[in-house]
């Protein structure tokens, strides 16, 4: 039987996936179908009792969790194709360990305990608002530190890292 041999370590995981399922608190949330997250593993806030992505100009204190990658789920594109215009239920990581994709900084050289920052303004196509970054922008207000989170060690070359959130 053919297989893969991991000579250094196994892959980090999928962005938005919980990495340590024993030590966590996840709450079910209503997602707003008119304000969709671009991907899993992004920081979110509450607006009108719905968990939605951050918007440019939000402050770091608005961050109330991380969107968890659920299974199974029907994608927004599939729901739109079927003509469903209702809010979905999703998962919000309130406390625990999760894999996220950082859009600035070098994930393989990250160290355990390093700070993690969240883009709240100055978003670009490569680093949109709500993503996690390892290094703050030159304009520090764009990427404030999320003091309730820290890195758990080096990540993958494509930017995936494990963070501890509210631990």
Task: Please tell me what each predicted stretch does.
Residues 1-167:
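Surface-exposed, low-hydrophobicity beta-strand/loop segments enriched in small/polar/acidic residues
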């Amino acid at each position: 039987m053919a297989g893969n041999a991991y000579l250094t370590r196994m892959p980090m995981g999928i962005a938005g996936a919980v990495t340590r399922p024993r030590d966590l608190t996840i709450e079910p949330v209503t997602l707003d179908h008119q304000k969709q997250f671009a991907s899993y593993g992004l920081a979110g806030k509450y607006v009108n009792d719905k968990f939605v992505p951050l918007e440019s100009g939000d402050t770091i204190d608005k961050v109330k969790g991380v969107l968890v990658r659920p299974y199974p789920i029907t994608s927004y594109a599939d729901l739109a194709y079927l003509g469903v215009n209702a809010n979905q239920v999703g998962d919000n990581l309130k406390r625990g360990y999760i894999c996220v994709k950082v859009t600035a900084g070098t994930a393989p050289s990250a160290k355990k305990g390093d700070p993690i920052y969240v883009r709240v303004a100055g978003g670009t196509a490569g680093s949109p608002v709500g993503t996690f970054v390892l290094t703050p922008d030159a304009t520090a207000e764009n990427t404030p530190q999320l003091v309730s989170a820290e890195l758990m060690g080096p990540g993958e070359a494509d930017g995936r890292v494990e963070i501890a959130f509210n631990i």
